[in-house]
Amino acid sequence: MPMAKKLNISRINELKTNAYDNIESYDDPDTPKALEQFTSQIKKVLQADPKMLESVPEYLPVALYGRVKFPSDAKLKWAHWINTATQPDWDEFKVTIGFNNADLPLVLAVRAYSEDLLIESCAVLYLLENQGKATPAPKRSADDDFEDEDSDYADYSDDDDDEGEEEDGYYDHYDDEDR
């Protein structure tokens, strides 16, 4: 069995910070559509020229921010991969994530350019969604943190009965692409 690739956690954390800074700079209550307009422009540019990601790799997680689903059973895998700095191979990765159908052309273009970068960007999105943002949260006791975490995940209960069902608007049939 080939040795697993390593995730570069320091790079992922740097990408997370840079992506979050970009997201924050456009997330302004006075211009509520600014982030949406910015990400829409980025998607078009990156889809046309994924090589741009060499100089601005944080733009991919910004472009996909809030538009990727991590099924509840997959979150444990992502937590493990990040804790052990293990990069999943494509077959492991593709079943732990759901991209919005509208983003598929971009996702496929980036995958063709750099599968590793796509996986890294999804690790960034996982961290943004599950660890909170780059800015430190107000200090609280450990007990408060634990109770808050439970409420943060109320939307992702494990008793979802949609196992095997498709969620409208999300795509998870990558094997079909290769046929």
Swiss-Prot record:
Phylogenetic lineage: Bacteria, Pseudomonadati, Pseudomonadota, Gammaproteobacteria, Alteromonadales
Region listing for Disordered, in residue ranges: 133-179
Domain of life: Bacteria
Its biological purpose: Part of an operon involved in cold adaptation.
Disruption-associated phenotype: Deletion of the gene does not affect growth at low temperature.
Identification of the protein by name: Adaptation to cold protein A
Inducing or repressing factors: Part of the atcJABC operon. The operon is constitutively expressed, and expression shows only a very slight increase at low temperature.
Bias type Acidic residues, positions: 144-179
Chain's gene name: atcA
